[in-house]
UniProtKB/Swiss-Prot annotation:
Name assigned to this protein: Nucleoid-associated protein VC_2039
Predominant subcellular localization, coarse grouping: cytoplasm
UniProt cross-references to NCBIfam families, sorted A to Z: PRK00378.1
Keyword flag Cytoplasm: yes
Keywords: Cytoplasm
Recorded superkingdom: Bacteria
Any one GO MF annotation of this record: single-stranded RNA binding
Length: 333
């Protein structure tokens, strides 16, 4: 990976003897060397691979935004910027019951001609190591793959298009932890692009296009499969869905209307590009549902062939059960 590191620093958030969250500040920024470059490169890679990211933008009165602008202009040293940010993060984090301890990593860097600011509170875990004398001793390590209190600012996008609603991205975190809430409060930012909604609008547009084009059942299944495969490939590549690019891979309607023109003419409010949501696009090729002790998933092409639904009685009939399920059912009789 081509990465140019400008600044990186670590501070520690921990609880004192009174169970109060405090900040242990590092005395100075880390040196830019192979170790720190490798650390930031790994943080960048893992963040890109994380699913379920949210997007946002600064509020007009964001104090953090003012600090960031001063830091970028050179009137506020990066070290002081990191101290102010660490204190602000501690104050926000202390309001929540989970109040995680960890190592705060702040890094200003460039990757693929794009400037970024990374801010993340990483778990500090213990493991074992073998010394040169073949003894066993404890060692601390940063659990980068488990990080979920993280945000990244696309500085290039922010500085060239302040009207953008997505230059700030963050990991939403585990359900119930409200990670997104406090991190947005810390940055004094609002939720911007709603990726879940964009994916749902895309799915509806696909349904409507197929209906408007009067596709046969087999054509609808094939069309949805192509959309799913494109979206899934984008997810695997860490790339975004580009509506015009997607349209170029899909067949037009019998009247010659392509998918991109259809979404524009019908007023679907789709961004030019957005991250694909795995759970949403999966529904293009599968029926999925859970509740009341049931968890069902089957290929959409089976509906009407091996799986039948009666809406009047709300009954689902399956003809031909999977062998492993059939074996379990017959053994319990």
């Amino acid at each position: 990976m081509s990465l140019f590191l400008s600044n990186v620093i670590l501070h520690q958030l921990r609880k004192n003897d009174n169970d109060e969250l405090v900040v242990n500040y590092r005395a100075e920024s880390l040196r830019n060397d192979t170790s720190t470059e490798n650390l930031v490169a790994e943080l960048h890679r893992v963040f890109n691979a994380k699913a379920g990211k949210g997007f946002g933008c600064f509020k007009s009165d964001s104090e953090f935004q003012l600090w960031l602008q001063e830091m970028r202009r050179g009137t506020l040293p990066f070290y002081e910027f990191s101290q102010q940010s660490a204190q602000r993060l501690k104050n926000e984090l202390a309001k929540y019951p989970f109040a995680d301890e960890g190592i705060l990593v702040m890094a200003e860097y460039q990757s693929l001609a794009t400037d970024y600011l990374f801010i993340g509170l990483l778990p500090l875990n213990q493991s074992l190591k073998v010394t040169e004398g073949l003894d066993i001793s404890a060692t601390d390590y940063l659990d980068i793959n488990k990080m979920d209190i993280v945000a990244r600012i696309d500085l290039s996008s922010y500085e060239t298009d302040k009207e953008s609603k997505r230059y700030l991205s963050y990991i939403k975190g585990r359900v119930g932890r409200k990670v997104a809430d406090f991190f947005l409060d810390f940055l004094q930012a609002d939720i911007g692009l709603d990726t879940k909604q964009q994916n749902q609008v895309l799915m509806q547009a696909v349904e409507d296009f197929c209906a408007d084009a009067k596709f046969e059942k087999e054509e609808v299944i094939s069309y949805k499969k192509q959309v799913y495969e494109y979206c899934n490939d984008q997810i695997k590549a860490g790339d975004e869905v580009r509506v015009q690019e997607l349209s170029g891979e899909l067949p037009p309607s019998n009247e010659g209307v392509n998918f991109f023109d259809f979404t524009r003419e019908q007023g679907y409010q789709l961004e030019e590009s957005f991250p694909a949501d795995r759970s949403t696009v999966r529904k293009l090729t599968k029926y999925v549902g859970a509740g009341g002790g049931l968890n069902l998933s089957f290929d959409s092409l089976l509906l009407g062939e091996r799986v039948f639904y009666d809406p009047e009685t709300d009954t689902l009939t399956i003809k031909g059960t999977p062998p492993n399920l059939r074996d379990q059912l017959t053994r319990l009789r």
